[in-house]
Amino acid sequence: PHPRAKNCTIAAAKLVLEAAVQAGAPEGIIDWIDVPSLEMTNTVMKEADIILATGGPGMVKAAYSSGKPALGVGAGNTPAIIDESADILLAVNSIIHSKTFDNGMICASEQSVIVLENIYDAVKTEFASRGCYFLNDAETEKVRKTIIINGALNAKIVGQSAAKIAELSGVTVPEGTKILIGEVESVDISEEFAHEKLSPVLAMYKATSFADALDKAEQLVRFRRYKNGDLDFSEVETFNLDE
């Protein structure tokens, strides 16, 4: 387990093991490391028949270099597109559920939402009515400086609540705030909100057309070679982005 999530990870593993054994699985079918360390992780990799590595580039590289069959899961930077054909209530609810589960730690949760300009205000109103807080320009700048520090994701915001991240940024938000939303324009790597944030912090973009929305989504996914895909809440046929 990750050192910062050791206790809850082990508790979850114990529950799954107990349920598996009660259902007839062999004792010890699920195991864990009580005191995690890089040395122990490398030892387990050398002894395993197959490795599923979820984590940063270092973890994935170590798995691929172990000499054993390995599946690596790296970072994700999932954008969602909401266009005119979408059910706005469903789209917003789905994003909020995804972004607040485990305080946004799942790498497949949305990191950005791209909204067509003619429904932008309606989508913004729906987010706000459901406990999401839209940062003003000054607040957006403060949160920017908290998301990325020295070119890397700030570990202090990972898995934290929106209120805690606001506090770290020097921003005051209403009690019960679910997500901090920054309205930004750039999808470039220089924009902190364009990165994977692993927390209830969301970037919101305005698109002039569906093609513009797709272009923004493609850039968000590709500028760091993220692999977790994107999500489209429109009711249209799926097609190849390269066509």
Residue ranges and their predicted role:
Residues 14, 49, 68-69, 128-130, ...:
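Short, solvent-exposed amphipathic alpha-helical segments in soluble enzyme
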Residues 27-31, 109, 177-179, 227-228:
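Residue-level recognition of the N-termini of beta-strands and the immediately preceding loop/turn
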Residues 44-45, 74-75, 105-109, 150, ...:
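Short glycine-enriched loop/turn motifs at secondary-structure junctions
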Residues 171-243:
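Conserved C-terminal structural/oligomerization subdomain of aldehyde/semialdehyde dehydrogenase
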